[in-house]
Amino acid sequence: MKTGNLFNTVALVGRSNTPGIAEPLATLAACIAKRGFEVVFEGDTAREIGISGYPALTPAEIGARADVAVVLGGDGTMLGIGRQLAPYRTPLIGINHGRLGFITDIAAADMQALVPVMLSGKFEREERSLLEARIVRDGEPIYHALAFNDVVVNRSGFSGMVELRASVDGRYMYNQRSDGLIVATPTGSTAYALSSAGPILHPQLQGIVLVPIAPHALSNRPIVLPDDSKIAIQIVGGRDVNVNFDMQSFTALELNDTIEVRRSKHTVPFLHPIGYSYYATLRKKLHWNEHASNEDDKAS
């Protein structure tokens, strides 16, 4: 059905294995459908909550058919569907039904008021970058993955430090003994990288940050690189080393394996309500400015 709006078909994606998510998803679907939009569900979401009356699609089918995806869940849900829809440039709207909610910025209590307004074309749009990584073993690529937040090379919980050789654009950077190394996007700079004393990168900054995890030498500090950098991390020493992609998929590594990381050609459009402020998100999520303030988020 044509609505005369920027969007016609809206996909709904929900957080897996979450008690109480069926009712808000059904409510949101009805709220959107009665305004003339076609509503489809991500297949696993539809099966899990037992909803009928709407098409149930794979992520690839959503990418080909939907104009926008509304995600109800936590940051992990947003990361997972974002990676799958990245090749299709499907815009995402995030509704927080998790704990932290750095990138799912709409409160569930506000979704019926805000989402229809956004679907009518009133929103703020930004592009979020991704990383692509491949593992090379004996000169041959053996694994490839996208990451929205970060690519993390780290040891298992029962092994000692690992030694990693890092180079950038073919130039040697250092050998580092540590618990691992994080390669993060600006979006991922407020995830694992932040807990390892990495800097916060504004999402619109074109950069990639390398953050050591518990390095043996305190002089091994985080460094922000240009986002067109090509990063190579070789496993020089250690055992039980893994590489994780957004902490949602991983593979075991062997000595002399190399992880090659670069910015992906794909970006994911995030849609926010009018008046969205990244700094307000930081204040709320990181508990900045705990004392009352008369300041607001209006541009001066």
From Swiss-Prot:
Protein name: NAD kinase
Entry's family note: Belongs to the NAD kinase family.
Pfam family, one: NAD_kinase
InterPro entries in the cross-refs: ATP-NAD_kinase_N (IPR017438), ATP-NAD_kinase_PpnK-typ_C (IPR017437), NAD/diacylglycerol_kinase_sf (IPR016064), NADK (IPR002504)
GO biological process, one term: NADP biosynthetic process
EC number: 2.7.1.23
UniProt entry tagged with the keyword S-adenosyl-L-methionine: no
Ranges annotated as spanning the membrane: none
Entry's Gene Ontology cellular component terms: cytoplasm
Cofactor(s) essential for the protein: a divalent metal cation
An example molecular function term from Gene Ontology annotations: metal ion binding
Organism per entry: Burkholderia multivorans (strain ATCC 17616 / 249)
